[in-house]
Amino acid sequence: MNCMKGPLPLEHRAAGTKLSAASSPFCHHTQALAMASVLAPGQPRSLDASKHRLEVHTISDTSSPEVAEKDKGQQGKNEDVGAEDPSKKKRQRRQRTHFTSQQLQELEATFQRNRYPDMSTREEIAVWTNLTEARVRVWFKNRRAKWRKRERNQQAELCKNGFGPQFNGLMQPYDDMYPGYSYNNWAAKGLTSASLSTKSFPFFNSMNVNPLSSQSMFSPPNSISSMSMSSSMVPSAVTGVPGSSLNSLNNLNNLSSPSLNSAVPTPACPYAPPTPPYVYRDTCNSSLASLRLKAKQHSSFGYASVQNPASNLSACQYAVDRPV
């Protein structure tokens, strides 16, 4: 408000400049112009006016603390930016350590002995190789990572190349036997005589029996007919008629004929025959080759072995032929 008034006396101006400077900063320039216009005609107080001008300017500069703070803040930011730029550049740079061949040899030899060296070992290696402990630690860390990667690749190659053909070779027969996991192809494949002859059966080999001829072992009509014929020989041998027994022995080759089976009557069996303890042994004895061997024994030794066929009698026939 004082800026809009007219010129004041010099004494009042000196006292009012301080108040006006503290109250409104926009009045300083107008007051300076007014003082210059008043003192222009050559009055003797020009030096005092110049002093007051200097005081007004200094007060106006220091009277605005907000502007000063802004200026200081801008200067501080500029200084911070200038100080941060070189530090950022240093952080972005990665210092790579170039190892010599001697250092690498020493590090590799230590790595072969111990892949996880402790603090003291790393310090010793650092002394030997003229490196820092941190560099040695980082080198061992990177070397272990490379070693693990190589081990994984080697295991993958072994599983892919080494064991693959072996597993494929083992699985080929099962692919042939079970194509598409369909179990209805067993009848189409069948078991031929050639496939059975090429296979080995240790049980039949121990008994000297061909597996193809094992069908005759489980044929009950032949065994029953042989036992019936052997039972017909017993009475003739007991009564002392050698001719009939020899004739019956000569006719053993025709045991499987239906005429003989129908001609020889078998009495009714009230109870089932007992199962022999050695099924395979009795059936082998009832085969055609064993009967021929018995015929030869009868012809050579007479009546000494005539009673042997009685062991092949069933329980029913033995009970009927036994004298009461």
Swiss-Prot record:
<dbReference type="GO" id="GO:0001569">
    <property type="term" value="P:branching involved in blood vessel morphogenesis"/>
</dbReference>
<dbReference type="GO" id="GO:0060460">
    <property type="term" value="P:left lung morphogenesis"/>
</dbReference>
<dbReference type="GO" id="GO:0001228">
    <property type="term" value="F:DNA-binding transcription activator activity, RNA polymerase II-specific"/>
</dbReference>
<dbReference type="GO" id="GO:0045944">
    <property type="term" value="P:positive regulation of transcription by RNA polymerase II"/>
</dbReference>
<dbReference type="GO" id="GO:0021855">
    <property type="term" value="P:hypothalamus cell migration"/>
</dbReference>
<dbReference type="Pfam" id="PF03826">
    <property type="entry name" value="OAR"/>
</dbReference>
<dbReference type="GO" id="GO:0061629">
    <property type="term" value="F:RNA polymerase II-specific DNA-binding transcription factor binding"/>
</dbReference>
<keyword id="KW-0963">Cytoplasm</keyword>
<dbReference type="GO" id="GO:0003700">
    <property type="term" value="F:DNA-binding transcription factor activity"/>
</dbReference>
<dbReference type="GO" id="GO:0042476">
    <property type="term" value="P:odontogenesis"/>
</dbReference>
<dbReference type="GO" id="GO:0045893">
    <property type="term" value="P:positive regulation of DNA-templated transcription"/>
</dbReference>
<dbReference type="GO" id="GO:0009725">
    <property type="term" value="P:response to hormone"/>
</dbReference>
<dbReference type="GO" id="GO:0016055">
    <property type="term" value="P:Wnt signaling pathway"/>
</dbReference>
<dbReference type="GO" id="GO:0042475">
    <property type="term" value="P:odontogenesis of dentin-containing tooth"/>
</dbReference>
<dbReference type="GO" id="GO:0055123">
    <property type="term" value="P:digestive system development"/>
</dbReference>
<dbReference type="GO" id="GO:0003253">
    <property type="term" value="P:cardiac neural crest cell migration involved in outflow tract morphogenesis"/>
</dbReference>
<dbReference type="GO" id="GO:0031490">
    <property type="term" value="F:chromatin DNA binding"/>
</dbReference>
<dbReference type="GO" id="GO:0001570">
    <property type="term" value="P:vasculogenesis"/>
</dbReference>
<dbReference type="GO" id="GO:0061325">
    <property type="term" value="P:cell proliferation involved in outflow tract morphogenesis"/>
</dbReference>
<dbReference type="GO" id="GO:0061031">
    <property type="term" value="P:endodermal digestive tract morphogenesis"/>
</dbReference>
<dbReference type="GO" id="GO:0070986">
    <property type="term" value="P:left/right axis specification"/>
</dbReference>
<dbReference type="GO" id="GO:0030334">
    <property type="term" value="P:regulation of cell migration"/>
</dbReference>
<dbReference type="GO" id="GO:0009653">
    <property type="term" value="P:anatomical structure morphogenesis"/>
</dbReference>
<dbReference type="GO" id="GO:0005634">
    <property type="term" value="C:nucleus"/>
</dbReference>
<dbReference type="GO" id="GO:0055009">
    <property type="term" value="P:atrial cardiac muscle tissue morphogenesis"/>
</dbReference>
<feature type="compositionally biased region" description="Basic residues">
    <location>
        <begin position="88"/>
        <end position="97"/>
    </location>
</feature>
<feature type="compositionally biased region" description="Basic and acidic residues">
    <location>
        <begin position="67"/>
        <end position="80"/>
    </location>
</feature>
<dbReference type="GO" id="GO:0060578">
    <property type="term" value="P:superior vena cava morphogenesis"/>
</dbReference>
<dbReference type="GO" id="GO:0005737">
    <property type="term" value="C:cytoplasm"/>
</dbReference>
<dbReference type="InterPro" id="IPR017970">
    <property type="entry name" value="Homeobox_CS"/>
</dbReference>
<feature type="region of interest" description="Disordered">
    <location>
        <begin position="57"/>
        <end position="111"/>
    </location>
</feature>
<keyword id="KW-0539">Nucleus</keyword>
<dbReference type="GO" id="GO:0008585">
    <property type="term" value="P:female gonad development"/>
</dbReference>
<dbReference type="GO" id="GO:0035116">
    <property type="term" value="P:embryonic hindlimb morphogenesis"/>
</dbReference>
<feature type="short sequence motif" description="OAR">
    <location>
        <begin position="286"/>
        <end position="299"/>
    </location>
</feature>
<dbReference type="GO" id="GO:0007368">
    <property type="term" value="P:determination of left/right symmetry"/>
</dbReference>
<dbReference type="GO" id="GO:1990837">
    <property type="term" value="F:sequence-specific double-stranded DNA binding"/>
</dbReference>
<dbReference type="GO" id="GO:0008284">
    <property type="term" value="P:positive regulation of cell population proliferation"/>
</dbReference>
<dbReference type="GO" id="GO:0009887">
    <property type="term" value="P:animal organ morphogenesis"/>
</dbReference>
<dbReference type="GO" id="GO:0003171">
    <property type="term" value="P:atrioventricular valve development"/>
</dbReference>
<comment type="subunit">
    <text>Interacts with EFEMP2. Interacts (when unphosphorylated on Thr-97) with ELAVL1/HUR.</text>
</comment>
<keyword id="KW-0597">Phosphoprotein</keyword>
